[in-house]
Amino acid sequence: MNLIENKIFDSERALYNIVDTRVKGCTFAGEADGESVLKETRDVLIEDCSFSLRYPIWHAKKYELKNSKLDEKTRAALWYSDDGIIENTEIKGVKALRECRNTIVRNCDIDSPEFGWKTDNTTITDSTIVSEYIFLDAKNIEIDHLDFKGKYSFQYVDGLVIKNSDLDTKDAFWHSKNVTVTDSVVKGEYLAWFSEGLTLIRCKIIGTQPLCYCKDLKLIDCEMQDCDLSFEYSDVQADVKGHIDSVKNPKSGSITADSIGELIYEDSIMECRAEVKTRSQTDK
């Protein structure tokens, strides 16, 4: 493997199309403000580097990005790249990952609006992410131990598994398909409207008007805090521990909780015939 070490690059396409190369301790910044410094690379290991230029890693194949920093000026850092590992790296630029395939993210700190759009086969573990519109229209995502904050998350995704995570969000999972969330906290209003095939297992759900207009919705051993006007027009099978503030116009299926503050049937635009019961009724 070739070695490029302790250099400073600021020109356009400075390391364009390098192959089988280790790039170590380099700085990508300067007056020339060049774009696309590592475009079209193959089999490249990038470690202990800092970036302050736009569009650095586009159309890369079989790359590793480790122990590096990409600041706010590093816009759209990784686009159209395949088979990548991003590890122990800080990413701060907008639109950091887009239309990439087969990406592994480990132990990273990411603050990037519009992160992960239209990606396929992404794995994230032990990371912190702040992002508006994360993973829009992405597919085949696996997440474990993620601390996430941001609005409009995981909309239009297809094929998502989340475990052991804390999601502080709003309008999450809208129009999503085939999503499973396990042992996680999901906080935020208007959760998962218009979703299909969403399963929540041992989760804590916090926020107003969750889980409306859903198809094939399942809640297994979940808690619901500050959840009013829940399940409107949803096809749902829900087993909830504790209290639900209110349930409104559930379309079909079954909802069971320890207690329900209010069951509302009014102003319905369709037949709503879901079975709603408390645990005491079930035990009789």
Question: What are the residue ranges of the model-derived segments?
Answer:
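Long, distal/terminal scaffolding or interaction modules
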Residues: 1-284
